[in-house]
Structures are given as C-alpha cells and as structure tokens.
Amino acid sequence: MTESELWSALVPELSVTDLEASLNFYRTVGFQVRFVRTSPPFAYLTLGDAQIMLEQAHSEGWVVAPLERPFGRGINLQIEVDNVQSTRAALTSLGLQVFREPSDSWYQVSGAYEEGQRELLVQDPDGYLLRFVQPLGRRSIER
C-alpha cells in the first residue's frame, strides 16, 4: 500500500469526551481501528475509503471555544456504506435513537442527471451528526 492509499486528502479529527465510548460506537457501525495512541488518547479509524480521527478532549488540544453538546454544530459527516439497513441494525443493538430514519434522496449533479443515495442520520456519543449513505445510482432528470 502506498502512502497516498493510506491517508485521505481530508480527514476530520473530532474531539470526544470519552474515547472508549466513541470507539465502541464507531466500531459498532463498522469502522476499524487503524492505530491508537495513549497520550493524549487518540484513534485513527477507517470504514471503506472513509477515514476519521478521534481525540479525547484535553487541556493541550486545539479547541478554539468551549466544547458544548452537541459537538460539531452546523456540520454533518457523510460516510458511504454498503447497506444502510445493516448500519441501522447495528445502531439498534446499541439502543441508540436515530436523528432521521433511512430515506432516499436525489441530488442534481448536472443539467441532465441526478444521483441518489439512501441516507440514515444519527448522532455519535458527543452529538456529531453522521450521515450514512448507500449509493442508489444515477438517473435522468425528467422535464
């Protein structure tokens, strides 16, 4: 594997309040741990081509304002999965409520086509909004 295959060009790093609780959540929805560090508590996770970093909040962290729940207000992270219903079932096993049940959405990508995805939205233990998507393909826009 080459270095460019190891690291995505953009990898979000999320401050979390309890790394172990976050790891339990992210593993349950399908992420794998690439590596961990203990000081400060940190983990690098992958799911298919998606990558994310988690770091337990600490006094030396890069925090520009007080962290208040829900964390990450104003953003959602889209993560492609093979099957949204499988992800939904994994969330049920944790007893978590979803933010939005699976539904199909179509987005215009050109003047003639739109691409669809089945979407499931859920908040992680710190409130970050995650949008798990299953691609549905492309279709012509009817006029």
Where are these regions (language model features)?
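Conserved active-site tyrosine of GNAT-family acetyltransferases
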Residues: 22-27, 91, 127
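Alpha-helical macromolecular-interaction surfaces
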Residues: 20-21, 86
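Conserved beta-strand-loop-alpha-helix junction that forms the acyl-donor binding cleft
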Residues: 13-18
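Vicinal oxygen chelate
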Residues: 1-11, 32-123, 133-143
